[in-house]
Swiss-Prot record:
Condenses 4-methyl-5-(beta-hydroxyethyl)thiazole monophosphate (THZ-P) and 2-methyl-4-amino-5-hydroxymethyl pyrimidine pyrophosphate (HMP-PP) to form thiamine monophosphate (TMP). This is Thiamine-phosphate synthase. It comes from Listeria monocytogenes serotype 4b (strain F2365). 2-[(2R,5Z)-2-carboxy-4-methylthiazol-5(2H)-ylidene]ethyl phosphate binds at residues 139-141, 171, 191-192. One of its GO terms (biological process) is thiamine biosynthetic process. PANTHER family: THIAMINE-PHOSPHATE PYROPHOSPHORYLASE (PTHR20857), THIAMINE-PHOSPHATE SYNTHASE (PTHR20857:SF15). Disulfide bonds: none annotated. The keyword Metal-binding applies. The gene is thiE.
Amino acid sequence: MRAELAVYFIAGTQDIVRGTLPGVLEEALKAGITCFQYREKGAGSLQTASERKEMALECQQLCTKYQVPFIINDDVALALEIGADGIHVGQNDEEIRQVIASCAGKMKIGLSVHSVSEAEEAERLGAVDYIGVGPIFPTISKADAESVSGTAILEEIRRAGIKLPIVGIGGINETNSAEVLTAGADGVSVISAITRSDDCYSVIKQLKNPGYPS
C-alpha cells in the first residue's frame, strides 16, 4: 500500500478547470500517478446518483487500463456496487466502524485524521489500511477543510509509533512535497497541483522525485 500512495491524485468534476475529468485523469495516469480517488463533492459537482455512477465507471475503467488503484470518497454503496479498489472517508463522513463492517476484506479502507489521537484510534481499529493526514498546508480545493496542521503533525504521528501508511493531504504541490515526505509521509495527495497545471507530466515527475528539475 505504501508504494501506491506515492502520488495520490484526488479529483471530481468540480475540480476540473480545463477539459473533462476523464481527460485530465488519463493524462495524469500516463504521467505516473500511483492512485486515484474519485471525490465528487461541493459546488459544481454532479448531483444525481446516476451521473456520479456513470462518471465513476468511466474513471474506474481508465484506472484499470493503467493498473492504478481506484478509490471512491465517502460513498460506500457506490464503491461496493462497482467493485472499487478502495473507499476513503473523513472523520465527519460515514462512521468508520460501519464502513469497516461493510467493506473490510472487499477493498482498501482509508481514513482522514487530523491529530495523533485520531491516528492512534485508526490503528487500533485494525482494519484501516492507510490514513490521510492534514491539511498540511492551506488548500483552495476543500471549502470544509480543517485548520492547517503543518508538517509537524506527521512527525508527531511517527514519533507516537504509528505504523500505518500515511498520505499527506492539503495544499501539497511539487514545491513543498519533499517537506511532507521528509516529515514521515509515504506519499502525497494532490488536487489542484494537477487539475490546474499546464504540464502535469512535469508536476508528477517532481512529486515522485523531489528535486527533479522543473
